[in-house]
Amino acid sequence: MKFGKVVNYHPDKGFGFIKPDDGTVDVFVHARQLIGTSDLEVGQRVSFETVLDQGRGKYRAEQCRVLD
C-alpha cells in the first residue's frame, strides 16, 4: 500500500493524479477506483495500490481511500 496527496482531480471527467509520498512519478486515478467516496479534492491524503497499465506503460492507482 502507498500513501500520497491528490494534486489534481476533475470531477466532471472522473479522474485525477496523486503524488506518492515516496517521491515517484504522479499516479493516475479514475473515479471507479475510489472507495468510500465519489470525488477527491486537491490536497487530500489518500492510500492506494499501484498497478502497471500494460497498454500505457504507466502506473495507475487502485483501491484509493481518503485518509483525512
Where are these regions (language model features)?
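OB-fold/S1-family single-stranded nucleic acid-binding modules
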Residues: 51-68
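A short macromolecule-binding patch
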Residues: 25-32
